[in-house]
């Protein structure tokens, strides 16, 4: 497997070693809606211990996030936070997890704190798991997803500090505008490399997750 390399400046990032051709963000195939922002474990922080954080946590934990519905998840969160007078910025762009293909994604930030309902799988990124076959790893991943969803969002997702394995490349954007960007992208590139395993709007991991819970 080729080494994943990132070459970045203030206006673009080029990633090699994931796909045959370099991934360039922003570009026609990997668009952004505005200025490029890099968000990672290194430049995010845990929320401070104060009453405002407790209110943010209460609202964050009150949302039941759907799987594969990041745009509507963040729209609900932003609406709830803004009703309480809390300033929050929705973001739309691309997230890389552990050097894998990027996924178009919607999340939110409050200053240098991230809010992302994606489960935090840092504990699964081990040398042992790296050597597992994709089907075995997917089975292990979905079991972990089911267990994590039994706990408060703030304990199992990126609440404040980003995952060590995640790199976000995104721009400020309202969730529904981000969804339109995604839909336009899929129409222009129906065989987009990041969605080559998508079927009826879900990927194989998400389908296994739904099947284990009797939802399909």
PLM region spans:
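A structural boundary/capping signal
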Residues: 2-216
